[in-house]
């Protein structure tokens, strides 16, 4: 996955949305813009969908054609400058998928994250030993070097929970996550200790969805919802799959996931009862 690929960031997505809106407001089709500026129609599509980052001269030509004056013009040019800055995923691009790299960048700038996990602990809360056990089991063919980079990425991601304006994290775990022995008893005890330590933070809420809750909306799989501090940046959903990952945008789809999460947290144990369940699991492992 090495190379000069464009990894999505919050600012690149914002610039793409801005340029699409400007073109629509100017009443111009992509074909007309292409004819007047010489910018390929495919390139315009990629720029407006944040799949490509425009060069400054390309952006200037678009702004000129759309008749964009100050302060919007400076805002767009500044977004391009900001979009050139490497995101958190820059250090790990060779070890992660393009979509996951984009997710890491989004997570680093998010205001809040809502996780539902049905199979294993959220990456933000994993210990190094737990993460190693997960990767060795789920991705047995990847190299030790890639595994090491991925684990380092997860450990560095956790910094969003401790910065001055920390990420607000709400996690709902299926009970299966705490019952499944990953890496052995010692690894699980350490992992539970990490979980419990994080529940003491004011910005972290953890709930367990018990087996006796029965059928639930999350049975189709895990997902993450990200919200951002700027209203110009719409919330999105990250879904991790076996063959590929997916970032979902668009109000109707994202709203459905939001409703699902609300249903799951309503069905889950209270944070206090969830902590009690984890503490009981620790005692069972240590006995």
Locate the predicted segments by residue:
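Interdomain hinge/linker segments and adjacent boundary elements that couple functional modules
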Residues: 2-21, 25, 30-35, 49-179, ...
């Amino acid at each position: 996955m090495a190379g000069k690929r464009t990894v999505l960031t919050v600012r690149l997505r914002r610039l793409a949305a801005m340029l699409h809106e400007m073109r629509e407001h100017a009443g111009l089709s992509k074909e007309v813009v292409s004819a007047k500026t010489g910018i390929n129609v495919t390139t315009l599509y990629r720029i407006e969908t944040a799949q490509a980052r425009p060069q400054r001269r390309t952006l200037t030509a678009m702004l000129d054609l759309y008749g964009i004056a100050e302060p919007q013009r400076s805002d767009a040019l500044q977004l391009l400058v900001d979009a050139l800055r490497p995101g958190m995923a820059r250090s790990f691009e060779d070890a992660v998928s393009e979509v996951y790299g984009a997710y890491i960048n989004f997570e680093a700038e998010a205001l809040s994250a809502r996780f539902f996990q049905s199979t294993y602990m959220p990456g933000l809360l994993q210990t190094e030993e737990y993460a190693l056990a997960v990767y060795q089991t789920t991705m047995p063919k990847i190299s030790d070097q890639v595994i090491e980079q991925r684990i380092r990425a997860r450990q560095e991601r956790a910094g969003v929970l401790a910065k001055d304006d920390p990420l607000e994290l709400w996690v709902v775990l299926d009970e299966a996550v705490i019952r499944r022995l990953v890496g052995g008893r010692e690894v699980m005890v350490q992992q539970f200790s990490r979980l419990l330590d994080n529940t003491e933070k004011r910005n972290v809420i953890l709930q367990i969805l018990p087996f006796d809750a029965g059928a639930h909306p999350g049975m189709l799989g895990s997902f993450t919802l990200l919200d951002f501090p700027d209203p110009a940046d719409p919330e999105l959903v990250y879904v991790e799959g076996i063959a590929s990952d997916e970032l979902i945008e668009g109000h109707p789809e994202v709203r459905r996931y939001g409703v699902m999460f609300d249903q799951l947290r309503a069905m889950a144990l209270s944070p206090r009862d969830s902590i009690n369940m984890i503490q009981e699991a620790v005692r069972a492992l240590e006995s």
